[in-house]
Amino acid sequence: MICHSIVCGRFKLMAHLFCPPPKLHYLCRMKTVRPKKNLGQHFLTDLNIAKAIADTVDACPDIPVLEIGPGMGVLTQFLMEKDRLLKAVEIDSESVEWLNSHYPALRENIIGDDFLRMDLSRLFGGRQFVLTGNYPYDISSQIFFKMLDNKELIPCCTGMIQREVAQRIASAPGNKSYGILSVLIQAWYDVEYLFTVNENVFNPPPKVKSAVIRMTRNSTENLGCDETLFKRIVKTVFGQRRKMLRVSLRQIMGDKAVAPEFWQHECMTRRPEQLSVAEFVELTNLVDAALKSAV
């Protein structure tokens, strides 16, 4: 494939000759918005990767799309080609100004706000939507916890995050990467680790590799246990992940006098990374019953 270099100020970027002018225009404007370390901004500069990320939303057709942290719109421009209702949330006022100037067709749908503080039910009038973006590393886990809190609104979430976080989300039981995010997300979503992205396609380059994932709501409507207790147990036992459950669960059971059979259950000699989502549901029901019958 034939490529050529475009030199824009301090940045030397690669663009394919077949890229239409608007996309090359984006590259030559890279210097107009300064990436801000406090916001965890790493602007993607590879158009092929941007298009590949945009294409991941096709798995959930016919519903609106919400992009988080569009920056200067390298992903936005490809999402706009999807002919779907698109809104973008950007906390950086400089980026909002740039987006309004260069994407006038999207101006009414560019929201200058903090995604983590927003009421998502108001975004599309209560309609479901796809969540996507080149997510800031610093808050990616918080974004996914908010997704879980709004899972009935978000049947599909795609995008790019730190590779280590993506590996945790997609990890299976028995793997050292398996943890809180793995269990809580896999309880409600099917997870696909799509591809890895190298550091050199960002400005500034991050110190770690990135990855693109897709999470699609599974058929689970009810876990079959107390969901609040389920989350509490998952977070508690992974907080002491190297200890057996009979040790870490004492933080939840406290001084309550429970039946001896509870502590003799076969799962008590296992560690949290050895339990599947279904086994965590079973454990939650076991703990729930023990707490209710405790003296």
Where are these regions (language model features)?
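Primarily a LysM-type cell-wall glycan-binding module
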Residues: R241
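Catalytic cores of RNA-modifying enzymes
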Residues: H16-T236, K256, E273, A278-V295
